Amino acid sequence: MQTTAEKTVLITGANVGLGKDIARQLASRPETARIYLACRNQDRATAAKADLEAKAGRPIFDIVLMDVSDPGSVRAGLAGVDGSIDAVVMNAGGMGGKTPMALTADGATYMFAQNVLGHVVLLETLLAEERLGEVAVFAGSEAARGIPKMGFKRPSFDSNSADELATVIDGSYFARGKPDVNLAYGQAKLIGILWMAYLARQYPDRRFISVSPGNTTGTQAPNDLALPLRIAAKYVMPRLGIAHMAGPRSSVHLL
């Protein structure tokens, strides 16, 4: 691990919430030389960059336009990044917006594409091009093991086969009933975690880590929840949850 200012880090979903605060905390480390803010919206990315540079007191941030729900956008964004990247933080994701079970052009649900597919393209491209230096961190969720009291059932499968997991990717898992968006989210995060474990076996010289930030306040994830949960997230959870700056710390300490 570098001790001089030469470490480069790429963070997805870096213009707001956990991703932005991960960038802020990393910028306070003297060994951090460059932070790529991978964001899908230019205006929001520009505003985040200006705010982060003002707080850091040094111009170490670059914007990479990238929509992780679109593999083509991920490839295009990554093509604009020169050289290797020491650490990747795959933070972008969420509950899939207003149409989480709609299919993208690639045949995956928007839920799965947003949380997993784009990150698969990102990380495996870096690995294929031998451009990942040290570590990749995937933002998991407690939903991957179920949160019954919050309406997130524990993901379970009959066979755990590749074919069965593929039904989560294209949404056909719910073909015989009404989709359970909370369950679909947990399933997506679980598959992402299993994928990271696979990569850890394939590339023992690098570190592949899945980490849940916990019930962290200040994120955009609750925006797509059902109304009762949105209200609870806005007014109740800030009093019970982990402080906003504490959640990102679990990822920062791994880099």
Residue spans of the language-model regions?
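Short coil/turn segments at secondary-structure junctions
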Residues: P179, L183, I231, Y235-P238
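A glycine/serine/threonine-rich, flexible loop-to-helix segment
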Residues: F152-P155, T217-V236
